[in-house]
A protein has these predicted regions:
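Glycine-rich beta-strand-centered segment in the early N-terminal region that forms part
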Residues: 21-39, 50-91
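C-terminal capping/lid region of NAD(P)-dependent oxidoreductase domains
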Residues: 290-297, 305-328
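Glycine-rich phosphate-binding loop and adjacent beta-alpha segment
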Residues: 221-290, 324-328
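Short, glycine/polar-rich helix-capping loops at beta-to-alpha or helix-loop-helix junctions
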Residues: 98-99, 175-183, 246-251
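Mid-domain Rossmann-like dinucleotide-binding core that forms the NAD(H)/NADP(H) cofactor-binding site
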Residues: 80, 122-197
Length: 328
């Protein structure tokens, strides 16, 4: 089978296609033909050794896939053969291997896909869907003004919708282009501003007063630009692992204004006993029309470098997906 491997850190060119034996499912395992594999920004950072944790090399990226069960090992019910499934491998301790034509996993780590949910949408609702779901429930947002950075991205586009459903008074979408602002509005954002406007925080103040909560999915210098938009007593939830850039003086200033700064990481919040129920909830919201999945581009396995370049240049919206068998 074909798979993507990283043997050295660097640009998208270090993503190489390698030939590997197709896995044989062991006892209790299934072999899944991968129809869609998710591409995430943290994988872009890992590839270039800019992530909070340096992965061991060689590595095969990919932590979320969807596909069809093609073979089963001993002890697995034969009824699983041919079923459409989602594999949130990251939630079950498997941190690599999804950028491939096939994966072998424990049968109890997958969940069935509704017939009306596409493979690509199922992938979009895994890492990014769960992140958005947990962020939307981290604090009560009822009657509050919430700013979401990168609001047209894979997490942001879902979070905007979930915050509105959770009765946020106003959801402000911070994006990088006019097209992305229009997308955020179509998803339910009440107000949009652009990173390109250096006075965006003042614009938010003038239109809506200050924000009670800011969910920062970007980090770096953008976190600093969020401070003037935050109300006294407000909170920034920092969900951009490895990209924290506030100085101690700026944090002291927040404390003086009774403002809070909270970190957010998805994996410590996930439990194998509940993650399937959470994903099934997201799948139901998507198939019932209450949650719109935004797809930002599909690429063959051979074009994985282009997928990483598109994400890195912030050209994309929503979820970027690989189609290892050209099913997209």
């Amino acid at each position: 089978m074909k798979a993507v491997q990283i043997s050295r850190f660097g640009g998208p060119e270090v993503l190489e296609i390698v030939g590997l034996p197709t896995p044989r499912p062991a006892r209790g395992q299934i072999l899944v033909r991968v129809h869609a594999a998710g591409v995430n920004y943290f994988e872009v950072l890992m590839r270039s050794d800019r992530y909070a944790i340096t992965p061991a090399l060689p590595m095969r990226p990919g932590v979320e896939v969807s596909g069809i069960v093609e073979a089963a090992g001993e002890g697995v019910a034969s009824g699983m053969l041919g079923t459409r499934v989602a594999l949130p491998t990251f939630a079950f301790g498997i941190s690599s291997g999804g950028y491939a034509e096939y994966v072998a996993v424990d049968a109890d780590s997958v969940l069935p896909l509704p017939d009306t949910l596409s493979f690509a949408d199922a992938v979009a609702l895994q890492v990014q869907g769960l992140t958005a779901l947990h962020l939307s429930r981290l604090r009560s947002v009822t009657d509050k003004t919430v700013v979401v950075t990168a609001a047209a991205g894979g997490v942001g586009s879902l979070l905007v919708q979930l915050l509105k459903a959770a009765q946020a008074r106003k959801v402000v979408a911070l994006t990088s282009s006019q097209a992305k602002q229009e997308l955020a509005l179509s998803l339910g954002a009440d107000y949009t501003v652009s990173y390109a406007d250096s006075n965006w925080a003042a614009t938010v103040h003038k239109a809506l007063r200050a924000a009670d909560l800011i969910v920062d999915l970007v980090g770096g210098a953008l976190t600093r630009s969020c401070l003037p938009a935050l109300a006294p007593g407000g909170e920034i939830v920092f969900a951009a692992l490895g990209r924290f850039d506030l100085s101690s003086e700026e944090v002291d200033g927040m404390l003086a204004n009774n403002q809070a700064l909270s970190g957010f990481a998805l994996l410590p919040r996930l439990a194998p006993s509940t993650v399937k129920a959470e994903l099934l909830e997201l799948f139901h919201q998507a198939t019932s029309g209450r949650l719109k999945v935004v797809l930002g581009g599909g690429f063959s396995l051979e074009r994985v470098g282009e997928a990483h370049r598109a994400i890195e240049s912030r050209e994309t919206v929503g979820k970027v997906v690989l189609y290892p068998h050209g099913d997209g």
